[in-house]
Every structure is written in structure tokens, then in C-alpha cells.
A protein has these predicted regions:
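Short beta-strand/loop motif that positions the catalytic acidic residue
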Residues: 219, 224-231
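Alpha/beta-hydrolase active-site loop
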Residues: 30-53
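C-terminal catalytic histidine-bearing segment of alpha/beta-hydrolase fold enzymes
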Residues: 200, 204-207, 233, 240-285
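Cap/lid segment of the alpha/beta-hydrolase catalytic domain
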Residues: 1-38
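Accessory cap/linker subdomain of secreted extracellular hydrolases
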Residues: 97-216
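Acidic catalytic loop of the alpha/beta-hydrolase fold
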Residues: 100, 229-234
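Loop/turn elements at helix/coil->beta-strand transitions in domains of secreted/extracellular proteins
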Residues: 9-15, 58-62, 86-90, 219-222, ...
Length: 285
């Protein structure tokens, strides 16, 4: 809200579209680049049309700003900006989600040597993300079954991803593990969560490698990225890999700003910097 207020005060029109499947029929296709990008570009065009019908004229210039899944969406909008047939000026992405497969694998490795309660926290986060992935896949493949990814004991929790957001899912996975810990001698040994090698399931693999990964094609407009060194939700390693892969296909990252922020403070600590970035990319008229 602080960012939006400051952008409005600077003279910008702010459009905040929601994602497909949130507040509309159907399942939300979590971290689907194309879905997010279409939501944004359609919203920008619709907003300009709405304002012009009321004799409120706006510039054809526009930028995207987003944090976390919103940062992921902002990068997707950069790829599909030409759909709007306007004048796209650039992207500011804060802790943008990417390389979810790597995040899941690295999380499992980290949990392997962690204490039981650290394991619980890590596993709950990983399983909440995985549940949202499966729900998103079911948007276009309704026959896809949670049991192809989860075990019987966790699939019932994962199904909640079709109606709940990340935090409630996290809480449910965590609570179930807590009961197991309390009744199994303070250990998670023997607790089964996901099917072996589920990331090799074709629909999951396609999602992780292709559908969810931003900047797989060259983007020629400016890109500014903020990343927290203490971020455990979108680790710096994931963003480093995103930038490396983007550079390989010819995309230039104009600025990569890092600091001692976690996932939330990467955004809250940089509101004024982001407003300044927007003014640089698209000076107010």
C-alpha cells in the first residue's frame, strides 16, 4: 500500500490485476508465466479503455513492478508486453519467483542435515509450494491426481491448494508433521510426504522447466531486480540462476541490487528506491 500510495502521489495510474482463478471461476494456475502475463497486459489495456471512455487520457507508456509471485508476473509481462500494443518501458522485479525445481531440490538437501523442527519448517514450505503447483497443473489438466505427487497422508492437505493460499497450506502441513513428531519420539523418521522422483512426472517437469520459468526468451526492455541475501523463500541462488539463464539468451539485466533483506523486507525496505526506478524508466508527465 505504501508503494501504491507513493506512485499515485507521483502522478502515475496504478493497475493491480489479480491472477487467473483468484476471484474468478477455475483453479489458479500458480506461477504460470503466460497466464500471469496475459492478466497484466489485458488489465493495462482495459484500464486505458475505461479511462478514455471517461475522457481521462493516459500515456501509452507503462512499466511493471512486482514482488515474489508478482515479480515473476512482472517478468512475464515483459516477455508478452507487445500484446498490449502500447509503449512498454521496463520492469522492476523484487525477489521474483523462479527456478522452483532448484528451490525444491536445495530445500530437501538442506533439510537432510537439519534438526527435526528445522526439517518440519522446511518440509512445510516445500510441500505448500508443491501443492500449489499441482493445483495449478489441474487448471489445464483436471485429470491430474494429487496422488501422482503426494502420498495418501499428505494428498488430502495438498488438495486444499485449490481453495487456500500459501500460509494456510503451510500451517496444515506443519500441524500434521507436529502431530507425527509428538507421537513418534520427536522424529520425522518414517514420515512420507511426496512420491519418489515426482519432479520427473511429465506434467510436473514441463511446468518446472518451461511453463513456470520467466525470461526464457530475450527481453530488450530494461529490467531491475532486487534480491535479499537472507531470503529463504526465493533464495539468492535461484535469482542468480535466473539472471544467468536470461543473459544466455541475450537479455540484459540493467541493475541487480542485493542487500541483507529477507523475502518481505526486500520489498518494504526498497519502496522509495522502486519509486525512483519507476521515475527513471518512465518519468511522470
Amino acid at each position: 500500500k505504501d508503494l501504491i500510495s507513493k506512485l499515485l502521489a507521483a502522478g502515475y495510474v496504478v493497475v493491480a490485476p489479480d491472477y487467473e482463478g483468484l476471484g474468478t471461476p477455475g483453479i489458479h494456475p500458480f506461477l504460470n508465466v503466460k497466464s500471469e502475463a496475459f492478466s497484466i497486459t489485458d488489465a493495462v489495456v482495459a484500464t486505458r479503455n475505461y479511462l478514455s471512455q471517461r475522457n481521462l487520457l493516459t500515456s501509452k507508456k507503462w512499466v511493471t513492478v512486482g514482488h515474489s509471485q508478482g515479480g515473476h508476473a512482472a517478468l512475464g509481462a515483459a516477455q508478452y508486453a507487445s500484446r498490449a500494443q502500447l509503449d512498454y518501458k521496463g520492469t522492476v522485479a523484487v525477489a521474483p519467483a523462479s527456478n522452483l525445481g532448484s528451490i525444491l531440490l536445495n530445500g530437501e538437501l538442506k533439510a537432510a542435515s537439519a534438526s527435526v523442527y528445522e526439517k518440519k519448517a522446511i518440509y512445510a514450505q516445500l510441500d505448500a509450494f508443491t501443492a500449489l503447483v499441482v493445483a495449478g497443473i489441474r487448471n489445464t489438466h483436471p485429470d491430474f491426481n494429487y496422488l501422482q505427487v503426494f502420498t495418501e497422508s499428505t494428498a488430502r492437505i495438498a488438495q486444499g491448494a485449490e481453495g487456500f493460499c500459501y500460509e494456510p497450506l503451510l500451517g496444515d502441513f506443519s500441524a500434521t508433521m507436529q502431530v507425527y513428531i509428538a507421537t513418534h519420539g520427536e522424529t520425522l523418521d518414517g514420515y512420507t510426504r511426496t512420491q519418489p522422483n515426482f519432479m520427473a512426472v511429465p506434467l510436473v517437469k514441463t511446468f518446472l522447466d518451461k511453463d513456470s520459468q520467466p525470461l526464457q526468451v530475450k527481453v530488450t526492455t530494461p529490467i531491475i531486480i532486487y534480491q535479499g541475501l537472507a531470503d529463504s523463500t526465493v533464495p539468492k541462488l535461484a535469482t542468480d540462476l535466473l539472471i544467468s539463464n536470461a543473459t544466455t539468451v541475450g537479455t540484459k539485466i540493467n541493475s541487480y541490487v542485493t542487500g541483507n533483506w529477507d523475502h518481505g523486507t526486500a520489498m518494504s525496505s526498497n519502496v522509495d528506491n522502486i519509486v525512483a526506478d519507476v521515475k527513471t524508466l518512465m518519468p511522470p508527465q
